């Protein structure tokens, strides 16, 4: 066994050296380090100020809480201000637009605002007989109403339960985002946040006789003449009943006179007087007042059960398997274009006849325009797709023909057409188009192709013809016009582009442009700097010391250098202090220690040189 160990001793030696290097009691060293940290006390100003990390942490936490509360309070104040502004605007809009639609002056608007500010609660049907009110009762606290469930923001799980997808598969919204799914619908069409407010809203809603929906609920009576009118009741004297005996007489003639008097409209008998709430009066005053007619209040008649059954529920779900009601067949009116107005697309292979197609405009004016003959009924205009396509197709052709005619008239003033014989084929086309346009003067609007007012046709062409010599040939004339056109187009494009740039140049873009200019200059300056090598700058700092163990201020070492060079020298000095090449010191005190850094050179040997010549214990020969 000893021979085997001696044989492989050179292989076991590196492993033993490696295990010897790792035989370190980490737990003991960590315990000693924690004990030293527990005994260390950080103080400033020669022990006057002691650093307590627990108090500092609590102070930072409290400051963060205070500032967060301030931010939340400011957030709520902003929302309150927005609600106040929106409510003020709504109040102004309501006060400026009365019910009758007329806009009054400021003097008449003030009492309306005062009336609309508070709602009268005298028309509530609840009895208040058993309620005792105490003046000296102390209010225990302010009751905050709960937020309705419809206004509570849903969580992420509720939002993702039934999402609404688009055609491309994107999530557009959730089911809770629509009020129709979170609120309770009222029969009048209002969405209520809670169903508890239905009866209260009906009780608070005033009765308006002008409302069209309540017209049929007003009690009506039929007079003798057969015309319906509102039910009237007479104010009787005290002690007399409305169902008392009929007064004297009672003949047929008197009844007819009473019927004629009742049939007269109220406007003819007495002027209109605005209704006012009755005031409490004494019996003597009521006896002295003459008898007057007033509207008698009647209870609303309940709707018959048959009408309630016939009215469908708009919110009731439909049965997908229910057979729909059969609707009667309605015969439609066919529309067709005459065969001689447009060529049929399916007759290419057939032999065409010698029949000439009828002009579309002549047929259209004869069929749909106004007729002088009143005995012939006027047809309706084009109302189907094929007719619309054909109509606008011919309109575009006519407009294009008119533009060609105007250009030709302008060119005829300085181009002799008869001598040079230009455009022989187009002449025939224009002549045919002019003949067709003769019957369609009222078919096209002249404003679409007319020249601006104050400018005679061909005025620009006359000026150009006067400036041109008579010896120019047609080719030279065309080249000159093309060059002028290209030059003018370039100028127009340049002017348009510059205008668009000026319009789009906003204040934000100006700030961005200034920031880009500043950043570009800084980046260019950074690119010109020499690459940073901490060892090179460390050698420069060491070379500035004249001898060992001599204190030298850092400001003296970096005097006259730019800011980025000072920063690099500072980093190199810290690295030298970490390698125990130099020693750093400063004056005591917080404020007094500013800019008092001094260095002392300990050795000329570099730490990187020691690492370069370092050899592991295992590699060293014993």
From Swiss-Prot:
Q: Which residues carry this modification: Phosphothreonine?
A: 19
**Assigned GO CC terms:** cell junction; condensed nuclear chromosome; condensin complex; intercellular bridge; nucleoplasm; nucleus
Gene Ontology terms, MF aspect:
chromatin binding
InterPro entries per the record? CNDH2_C, H2_M, H2_N, Ncaph2
Residue stretches of biased makeup (Low complexity) = 262-273
A Gene Ontology biological process noted in the UniProt record is: mitotic sister chromatid separation
Chief localization: nucleus
Compositionally biased intervals (Basic and acidic residues):
294-312
Pfam families tied to this protein: CNDH2_C (PF16858), CNDH2_M (PF16869), CNDH2_N (PF06278)
This protein's UniProt keywords: DNA condensation, Nucleus, Phosphoprotein
Q: What are the Phosphoserine sites (modified residues) in this protein? A: 95, 199, 223, 227, 282
Carries keyword Lyase? no
Annotated region Disordered: the residues are 207-354
Location in or out of the cell = Nucleus
| Family the UniProt entry places it in | Belongs to the CND2 H2 (condensin-2 subunit 2) family.
Please explain the role this protein plays, according to its UniProt record.
Regulatory subunit of the condensin-2 complex, a complex that seems to provide chromosomes with an additional level of organization and rigidity and in establishing mitotic chromosome architecture. May promote the resolution of double-strand DNA catenanes (intertwines) between sister chromatids. Condensin-mediated compaction likely increases tension in catenated sister chromatids, providing directionality for type II topoisomerase-mediated strand exchanges toward chromatid decatenation. Required for decatenation of chromatin bridges at anaphase.
The UniProt subunit note reads as follows: Component of the condensin-2 complex, which contains the SMC2 and SMC4 heterodimer, and three non SMC subunits, NCAPG2, NCAPH2 and NCAPD3 that probably regulate the complex.
Q: What is this protein's name?
A: Condensin-2 complex subunit H2
């Amino acid at each position: 066994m000893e021979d085997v160990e001696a044989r492989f001793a050179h292989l076991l030696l590196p492993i033993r050296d490696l295990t010897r290097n790792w035989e370190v009691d980490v737990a003991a060293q960590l315990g000693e380090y924690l004990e030293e940290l527990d005994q260390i006390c950080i103080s400033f100003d020669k022990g006057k100020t002691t650093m307590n990390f627990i108090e500092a942490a609590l102070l930072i936490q409290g400051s963060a809480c205070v500032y967060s509360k301030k931010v939340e309070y400011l957030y709520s104040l902003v929302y309150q201000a927005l609600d106040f502004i929106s409510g003020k605007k709504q109040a102004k809009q309501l006060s400026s637009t009365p019910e009758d639609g007329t806009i009054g002056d400021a003097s008449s608007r003030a009492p309306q605002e005062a009336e609309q500010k508070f709602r009268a609660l005298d028309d509530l049907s609840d009895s208040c007989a058993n309620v005792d009110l105490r003046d000296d009762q102390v209010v225990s606290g302010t009751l905050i109403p709960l937020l309705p469930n419809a206004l509570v923001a849903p969580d992420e799980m509720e939002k993702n339960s039934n999402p609404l997808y688009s055609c491309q598969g994107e999530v557009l919204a959730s089911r809770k985002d629509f009020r129709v799914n979170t609120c309770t619908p009222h029969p009048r069409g209002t969405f209520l946040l809670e169903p508890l407010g239905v009866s209260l809203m009906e009780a608070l809603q005033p009765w308006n006789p002008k409302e069209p929906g309540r017209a049929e609920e007003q009690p009506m009576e039929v007079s003798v003449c057969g015309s319906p009118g509102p039910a009237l009741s007479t104010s009787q004297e005290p002690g007399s009943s409305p169902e008392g005996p009929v007064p004297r007489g009672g003949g047929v003639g008197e009844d007819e006179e009473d019927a004629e008097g009742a049939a007269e409209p109220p406007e003819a008998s007495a002027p209109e007087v605005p209704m006012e709430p009755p005031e409490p009066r004494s019996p003597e005053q009521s006896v002295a007042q003459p008898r007057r007619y007033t509207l008698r209040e009647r209870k609303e008649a309940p709707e018959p059960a048959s009408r309630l059954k016939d009215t469908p529920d708009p919110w009731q779900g439909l049965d997908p398997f229910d057979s729909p009601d059969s609707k009667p067949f309605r015969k439609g009116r066919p529309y067709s274009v005459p065969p001689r107005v447009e060529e049929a697309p399916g007759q290419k292979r057939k032999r065409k006849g010698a029949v000439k197609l009828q002009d579309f405009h002549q047929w259209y004016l004869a069929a749909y325009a106004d007729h002088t003959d009143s005995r012939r009924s006027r047809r309706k205009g084009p109302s189907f797709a094929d007719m619309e396509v054909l109509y606008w197709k011919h309109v575009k052709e006519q407009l294009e023909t008119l533009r060609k005619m105007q250009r030709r008239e302008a060119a005829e003033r300085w181009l002799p057409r008869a001598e040079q014989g230009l455009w022989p084929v187009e002449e025939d086309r224009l002549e045919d188009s002019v003949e067709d346009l003769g019957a369609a003067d009222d078919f096209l609007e002249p404003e679409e192709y007319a020249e601006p007012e104050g400018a005679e046709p061909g005025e620009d062409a006359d000026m150009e013809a006067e400036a041109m010599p008579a010896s120019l040939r047609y080719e030279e004339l065309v080249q000159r016009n093309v060059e002028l056109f290209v030059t003018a187009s370039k100028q127009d494009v340049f002017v348009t582009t510059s205008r668009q740039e000026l319009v789009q140049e906003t204040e934000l873009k100006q700030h961005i442009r200034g920031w880009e200019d500043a950043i570009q200059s800084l980046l260019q300056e950074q690119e010109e700097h020499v690459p940073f090598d901490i060892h090179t700058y460390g050698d420069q700092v060491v070379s500035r010391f004249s001898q060992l163990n001599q204190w030298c201020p850092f400001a003296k070492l970096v005097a006259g250098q730019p800011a980025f060079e000072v920063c690099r020298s500072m980093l190199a000095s810290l690295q030298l202090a970490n390698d125990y090449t130099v020693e750093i010191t400063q004056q005591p005190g917080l404020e007094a220690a500013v800019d008092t850094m001094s260095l002392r050179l300990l050795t000329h040997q570099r730490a990187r040189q020691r690492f370069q010549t370092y050899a592991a214990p295992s590699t060293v020969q014993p």
